[in-house]
């Protein structure tokens, strides 16, 4: 039997877990202010007069204000010079103030009024009026819904609307030490949950049961539960993001579990693949090829190297092991990795079309999955962050198919 897989009851596995949140340090108000200052520097270098930061991750990142987007327009203006200005429905203004970390004026609109007109009026009031001859450039955060962009566009003949991604992505891709510490804690928590989940596997258990256990295990280590969870058995493991129907575990099935949690808004996302029982020669070959490809991608991830080269290194490794080429199956049907932070998938991406040079503070998943349709799939997903000395793993990669969690002594 694979080491660490099976042998415990759900109750025993949960009781062995404990809260891991001691000493967590949230992002400070000073750091939010620093982020705003950095964004303003980037705006000035790009000739952008102001950016609209829509409710959601970007608003939280720059202001600390947690507000989920809806059909009602909520967000903040950040001018290239000066203080931020919020926009919100009149009836939400006090709630918004309660959630503020960076406090500022709130411009309000009643339900029968146009928030898009308020958008234009607020810009004019803070010294950015529309000009037809030389329209100021106004960036809209890339997560702003189209219906809001369209509503604004109908009223902004004297403004040039542009994508604010050069500002938002530039600031968010390179994490601070405090961000990396929060991500490290989230990943440490999820690794312990992975070990616990592996220990409860038994013939006849369903993917639904394991999913429920993982949610409770994440709570036990101090998270609010799983941020997401994919549990797959047998042939279903060849589907990167799963199948519709639950599966029941059988002896010698491949198991794939991909899950994560949030700590102060920062996300973990870790996948483990192993066999419930004794690996056969085919399973062992694919698993070893996956581990080799993951290691090749990590080795290629050096400062200044374009993201695409990391993806290419994984694909070259897989071809050498008899898989692919490119996106062909059996092989790797998707990119090698993605950036991660407050969003589970964010820039930059380890994919053939991304020329972004790797830089200190960037954080990535490394998951060059091998899919063998009709048989099984293997995905080993760990994350790394770039330092002045090169890449550093957040979590130790799986040791072997026989001892995926490195438990043997």
Feature roles, as predicted:
Residues 1-409:
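Active-site neighborhoods and metal-handling regions in enzymes and metal-associated proteins
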